[in-house]
Amino acid sequence: MDGIWNYIVVIYWIVMGCSLLMVTIKLIIPQYIFSMDEVTQNKEQVFQTVLNVIERDLGIRVNGLSINYDYSENDELKGFYDPKNHSITLFMDNMETVHSFVLTITEEIHHSIFVSSQSGMKLYQSYHRKVGYDNNPLEYSAKVYARDKFKQIHRILKKKGLIFYKV
């Protein structure tokens, strides 16, 4: 009988240790665990806040930019900027976490600034034909900018109460 109690105590401590580990992970890096739909009620305000941060950072004003949230299946894209109607489309099913949402929206806003003109679009397409998507300097600069600004944007979104993590 004494051996059974020892097993029960060991199992109890293993379960408690795993639970404590999961809570600790959720507290330390929640942006890599939760999806955007789980942590915010108003994605439009999140978009406007990210846009305002980028406008302040670059010292410019972006007029008439709209955003669409698409929940349909798409195997290739997380989002794209359409210069014809000056809009961003985000494929929400392809973004598992807050981190990927913020990075994608920042990249697409960056594209709306630097690829929105006819000459910018021609330059983008020229690079795309010559070196492909992964080596396109306009794509690379958008990705680097998004990575550099993630912590600042994430902090502002949390401070304004636009995203909140339930642990």
Which residues fall in each region the model found?
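A metal-dependent hydrolase signature that marks the N-terminal structural subdomain at the beginning
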Residues: D2-K78, D82-S87, E96
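Amphipathic alpha-helical segments that form well-ordered structural scaffolds
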Residues: T49-V53, S141, Y145-K149
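Short, polar/charged, Gly/Pro-enriched helix-capping and turn/loop motifs at alpha-helix termini
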Residues: R61, S119-G120, I156-K160
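Polar low-complexity intrinsically disordered regions
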Residues: Y81, L90, T104, G161-V167
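Short pre-active-site segment immediately N-terminal to the catalytic Zn-binding motif
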Residues: I88-I105
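Post-HEXXH active-site segment of zinc metalloproteases
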Residues: H99, V115-V144
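Active-site recognition of the HExxH zinc-binding catalytic motif
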Residues: L103-S116
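Long, well-structured alpha-helical subdomains associated
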Residues: G132-N135, A146-V167
